A protein has these predicted regions:
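N-terminal Rossmann-like or analogous alpha/beta NTP/dinucleotide-binding catalytic cores
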Residues: 2-136, 293
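Short, conserved loop/turn and helix-capping segments at secondary-structure boundaries
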Residues: 20, 52-55, 153-157, 211, ...
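Short, histidine-centered active-site or binding-site loop motifs used for metal coordination
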Residues: 8-10, 41-43, 143-145, 202, ...
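Catalytic-loop motifs flanking and including active-site residues across diverse enzymes
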Residues: 22, 87, 128-131, 155, ...
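Internal, conserved structured core segments that host functional sites
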Residues: 105-166, 170, 190
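Short helix-capping/linker segments at secondary-structure and domain boundaries
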Residues: 97-102, 140-147, 251-259, 289
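A short, charged/proline- and glycine-enriched loop
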Residues: 1-2, 300
């Protein structure tokens, strides 16, 4: 069975864009691949954060992944497997400075910091080395495939280059060259501004919590923007298209087909579309919300199980590090 690695930063609650764009796919992949999924708290440290928030969000994200159907034995918390950081250092020595400065995400996040704090903004070296740690995350488990979106293709290509360079420098085809795993995932946009991707960084109006309050979910859908004002004649507006995308992502195809027929007949009522979308989300989310509450009621056991799964997964990372240290001329750890 082929190996799959994917990861998510613990930046707070999952929103429906996270679920439809990644987590739902993670759950499905477990049936066909040997999957390892990381809650990557080291990566979150590359941007300004509060220590207490990081710890709380790490566990919150872990519990929410479990509630969605990710198996506990497939989850690890990155900082509980410190071999990731050691491998990142070794791999950084076969990575060029120029490669890292060309990374689009580094440029974008550096600009974000400068926009917030001015030209004298502190941009940590961790942000520059983020892609090397990401390469370590992937290579340490000899992943064959990595589910990626378009925004991560550049980082995966760098991981492949780093693997190739390490293998060449140390004379052995040791690391696999991970391939992107493309699956059909809907692009869910902000309900408040459907010209932009759903994101927590834009503010509360711009995302819908996956496991949030039902009334709030319905209210956000009810107030979702439908008319963006600049839609070419004969084309569906971005806001209406976004609502249809959510309905399809919820697999409510009967409602989707019926409402789409109304749209093409010029008889679509936005209120009916929004009601169907809200109902579909609530139906999808309620079982996961119940799972989440059950997990929270047994916090200690759940946390212990994830520490155990992280320890088991760490054994694989330790084996990789033993072999990497030998290949790269470092003494064996007793």
């Amino acid at each position: 069975m082929k190996n799959v690695l994917s990861a998510i930063q613990p930046t707070g609650d999952l929103h429906i864009g996270n679920y439809f764009g990644a987590v739902q796919n993670w759950v499905r992949l477990q049936e066909s691949y040997n999957c390892v999924y990381g809650v990557v708290d080291y990566h979150t440290m590359t941007m300004p954060y509060k220590a207490s928030d990081l710890l709380e969000n790490t566990w919150k994200m872990t519990f929410q992944l479990l509630a969605c159907g990710v198996k506990p034995e497939n989850i690890f918390i990155q900082s509980l497997v410190p071999e990731h950081a050691e491998l990142a250092w070794i791999l950084s020595c076969v990575t060029s400075y120029g490669e890292l400065t060309r990374m689009t995400q580094f440029k974008d996040k550096s600009k974000q910091l400068e926009d917030n704090d001015g030209k004298e903004a502190f941009v940590g070296a961790g942000l520059l080395f983020y892609p090397v740690l990401q390469a370590a995350d992937i290579l340490i488990y000899h992943a064959d495939y990595v589910p990626v979106g378009k925004d991560q293709e550049q980082h995966l290509e760098l991981s492949r280059s780093i693997a190739q360079r390490f293998n060449f420098q140390f004379g052995k085809e040791y690391f696999r060259h991970p391939e992107p795993l493309y699956t059909e995932t809907p692009k869910i946009l902000s309900p408040a501004d459907p010209t932009r991707k759903m994101s927590k960084s834009l503010g509360e109006k711009h995302y819908i919590n996956l496991l949030g309050d039902e009334d709030r979910t319905r209210k956000q859908i009810k107030s979702a923007v439908t008319d963006t004002g600049d839609t070419p004649a004969g084309q569906m507006s971005a806001g209406v298209l976004n609502l249809f995308e959510i309905l399809r992502a919820c697999n409510q195809m009967d409602a989707y087909d019926s409402l789409m027929a109304d749209y093409h007949a010029g008889a679509l009522k936005y209120s009916a579309l929004k009601e169907s979308v809200a109902d579909a989300l609530v139906e999808l989310i309620n079982p996961m919300r119940e799972n989440y509450q059950a997990l929270l009621a047994d916090k200690r056991r759940v946390r212990d199980s994830i520490k155990d799964s992280s320890a088991v997964i760490r054994q694989r990372a330790q084996q990789t590090l033993r072999e990497v240290r030998e290949l790269s001329g470092l003494p064996a750890v007793k």
